[in-house]
């Protein structure tokens, strides 16, 4: 709401105000003849836009010569002019409905020192309106004001005109007798505002609004809004409001989630945004001491400053923020640590006493961070303690885009980003990447661009900065190089199908299609957050390769394979913990696939006896039936060659669907041999006949043996297509193969 300006812009000479007392009026002064040019039609107001910075009310003064305008020191500083300078001045005509509905002013002393004052907001508002009514005030403008013998500087922090859209221009308005004025003062100013009602007092924060991207926080808008509502909304209001509501401030919050998602960053930025004491940042293990009682004293010392302020200042005390990184290191469940000292139990007791004890502090905000919430003592998580618990999870695609924009912002500003960069595509490609991993991708991409400008033969060669360009190809290389901790284990899955996938006939194709329907069901259904499928069949029939192919083709962000080969030599309890961790990690991803390969091997099954691990069996049965958290979806595939055993122990009943993966019949084997093209056309039928009812894995092994030739050295020519496998040698290999494997 800019108003209208006079058609004529004057250039006037800046002078001092005629007398010291006029400096406190916030008026500008000029000659009587010049004053007429700034008259607002239909009123007795004289308004001028000075240097396109702010609007001042003018008054005529006999000592001011024509062509001069008198400004006080504060006004000259705001207009960035000195006495004797020329400044542009034009008439300002306010638009309709220009009266201020609400005005927020920050108070500070003109002479800063150790003096402290208590200011009555109601009396100051009355005095201010008496002197400043019908003046136009602009956000950012400063004015000097004398109140009860003390000189103050007023800074306009907010100017709200009813119905005005702040996005359309500068925030300003006309002070009227109906304007509601809110006064603010920083804790360091020495000014205490009393008798102020009905309006929020936002001096708890250093800034009046938050731009999370400028703080380096991306993809956490919803989480930050939740934190603000629950932990800070009550602190924004004056103490008497919360007192009348009968509520207590939140004293603690817990940020938990996977590593690298921004928990520490958010806690640090929250600490920086708050007015008051600098936050105390404590890494969990730093509190511990080898001396008896010293650890508990270290905890008490963290709260010492807050206790002192509470005693001396009461409700006016500054907020003290204490940030505990890796809080699970010192606040484990009481009784879980068997070190004989009980020091971890004492730490929990000491924290509970300080936060929520008999003499609990009301000026403390404790922020804890952990990726192992399950290790914390339950008493810490109850209301009154770390009651606000916010999960900082892996960012979604929109969040990843914000994070990439933050980390590439400087590159873009300095023209280092190539024109082919598509951040939206990169965000789509980086599923389940944490914020830290996305930063790693940007660093890796930058390293490729920088490396192109270096010569290994002469590292002292000057670098031409304008040639540094980070391209889309650099980012694609970086994505391949930096793998997410909670992503799909593509390399592990590819190792499960080293020979690729061939068409094994309609029976295998049917199983693949039915399994992909389960994938689609998990993706779109709101009623099936957990789907489980068991692939059973003879050893070597391709169950693991089929499951791995489904995992790769599913395009799920998290695909993990659990096999006995990664747990060789581990105890039963350690194996259980490993399996549980894989499931817990899967719950952190929106959609996940877990492949339990060779379940009988995981259970340490031996047919003689029989023997198996009951602990692992019970763990699997619980996990296969446990629903993932709300909003998360999980698909579990299991493979086994001992389905009868799994039926006897009840594990097969935990799977919703069971598919039998068969051996290859003659027609299937012929189809495979035709695709491999290693036999002559005349020999394919004979070879397929011999391979009837054989698993695909054994077929591959047999063909590998036959491809070596009778005297060895034939494999290269055969795979290159220059020669074919000799059918007689193939039969010889088949006889040996059956004798040794059958």
Swiss-Prot record:
GO terms for cellular component: cytosol; Golgi apparatus; plant-type vacuole; plasma membrane; plasmodesma. GO terms for molecular function: ATP binding; ATP hydrolysis activity; metal ion binding. The keyword Nucleotide-binding applies. It comes from the Eukaryota. Its cofactor is Mg(2+). Mg(2+) binds at residue 544. It is an enzyme of class 3 (hydrolase). It is found in: Cytoplasm. Pfam families: AAA, AAA_lid_3, CDC48_2. Keywords: ATP-binding, Cytoplasm, ER-Golgi transport, Hydrolase, Magnesium, Metal-binding, Nucleotide-binding, Protein transport, Repeat, Transport. It catalyses: ATP + H2O = ADP + phosphate + H(+). PROSITE patterns: AAA. Belongs to the AAA ATPase family. Homohexamer. Binds to SNARE-SNAP complexes to form 20S particles. This is Vesicle-fusing ATPase. It comes from Arabidopsis thaliana.
């Amino acid at each position: 709401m800019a108003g209208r300006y006079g058609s004529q812009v004057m250039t006037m000479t800046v002078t001092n105000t005629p007398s010291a007392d006029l400096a406190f009026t916030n008026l500008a002064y000029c000659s009587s003849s010049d004053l007429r040019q700034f008259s607002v039609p239909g009123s007795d107001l004289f308004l001028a836009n000075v240097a396109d910075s702010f609007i001042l009310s003018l008054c005529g003064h006999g000592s001011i010569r024509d062509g001069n305008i008198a400004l006080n020191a504060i006004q000259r500083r705001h207009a960035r002019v000195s006495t004797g300078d020329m400044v542009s001045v034009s008439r300002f005509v306010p638009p309709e409905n220009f009266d201020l509905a609400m005005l927020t002013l920050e108070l500070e002393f003109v002479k800063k020192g150790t003096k402290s004052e208590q200011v009555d907001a109601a009396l100051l508002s009355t005095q201010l309106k008496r002197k400043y009514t019908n003046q136009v005030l602009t956000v950012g403008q400063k004015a000097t004001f004398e109140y009860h013998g003390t000189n103050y500087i007023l800074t306009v922090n907010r100017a709200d005109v009813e119905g005005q859209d702040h996005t359309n221009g500068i925030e300003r308005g006309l002070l009227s007798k109906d304007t509601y004025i809110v006064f603010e003062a920083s804790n360091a100013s020495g000014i205490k505002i009393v008798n102020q009602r009905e309006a929020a007092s936002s001096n708890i924060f250093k800034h009046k609004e938050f731009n999370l991207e400028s703080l380096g926080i991306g993809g956490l808008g919803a989480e930050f809004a939740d934190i603000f509502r629950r932990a800070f909304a009550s602190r924004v209001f004056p103490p008497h409001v919360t007192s009348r509501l009968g509520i207590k401030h939140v004293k603690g919050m817990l940020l938990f989630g996977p590593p690298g998602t921004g928990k520490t960053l958010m806690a640090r930025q929250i600490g920086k945004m708050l007015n008051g004491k600098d936050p105390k940042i404590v890494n969990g293990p730093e509190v511990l001491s080898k001396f008896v009682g010293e650890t508990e004293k270290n905890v008490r010392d963290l709260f010492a400053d807050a206790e002192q302020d509470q005693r001396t200042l009461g409700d006016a005390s500054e907020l003290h923020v204490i940030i505990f990184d890796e809080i699970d290191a010192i606040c484990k469940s009481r009784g879980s640590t068997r070190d004989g000292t009980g020091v971890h139990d004492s730490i929990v007791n000491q924290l509970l006493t300080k936060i929520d004890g008999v003499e609990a502090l009301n000026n403390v905000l404790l922020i804890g961070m952990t990726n192992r919430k399950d290790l914390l003592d339950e008493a810490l998580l109850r209301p009154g303690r770390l009651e606000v618990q916010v999960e900082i999870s892996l960012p979604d695609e929109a969040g990843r885009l914000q994070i990439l924009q933050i980390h590439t912002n400087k590159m873009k500003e300095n023209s280092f980003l190539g024109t082919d960069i598509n951040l939206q595509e990169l965000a789509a490609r980086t599923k389940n990447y944490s914020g830290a991993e996305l930063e790693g991708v940007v660093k890796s991409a930058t390293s490729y661009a920088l490396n192109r400008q270096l010569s290994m033969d002469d590292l002292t060669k000057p670098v031409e900065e304008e040639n540094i360009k980070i391209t889309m190809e650099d980012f694609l290389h970086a994505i391949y190089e930096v793998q997410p901790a909670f992503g799909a284990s593509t390399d592990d899955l590819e190792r499960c199908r080293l020979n690729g996938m061939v068409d094994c006939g309609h029976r295998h194709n049917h199983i693949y299609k039915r399994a992909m329907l389960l994938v689609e069901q998990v993706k779109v259904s709101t009623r099936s957050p957990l789907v489980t499928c068991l692939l059973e069949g003879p050893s070597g029939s391709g169950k693991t390769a089929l499951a791995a192919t489904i995992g790769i083709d599913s395009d799920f962000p998290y695909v993990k394979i659990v096999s006995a080969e990664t747990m060789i030599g581990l105890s039963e309890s350690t194996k259980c913990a490993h399996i549980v961790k894989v499931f817990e990690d899967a719950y952190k991803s929106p959609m996940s696939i877990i492949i339990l390969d060779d379940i009988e091997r995981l259970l340490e099954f031996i047919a003689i006896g029989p023997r198996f691990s009951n602990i692992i069996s019970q763990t699997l049965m619980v996990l296969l039936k446990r629903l993932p958290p709300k909003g998360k979806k999980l698909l579990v595939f299991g493979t086994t060659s001992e389905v009868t055993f799994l039926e006897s122990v009840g594990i097969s009943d935990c799977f919703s669907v069971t598919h039998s993966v068969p051996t290859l019949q003659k027609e299937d084997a012929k189809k495979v041999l035709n695709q491999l093209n290693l036999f002559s056309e005349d020999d394919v039928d004979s070879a397929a006949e011999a391979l009837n009812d054989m698993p695909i894995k054994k077929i591959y092994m047999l063909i590998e043996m036959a491809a070596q030739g009778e005297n060895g050295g034939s494999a290269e020519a055969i795979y290159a297509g220059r020669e074919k496998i000799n059918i007689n040698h193939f039969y010889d290999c088949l006889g040996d193969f059956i004798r040794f494997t059958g």
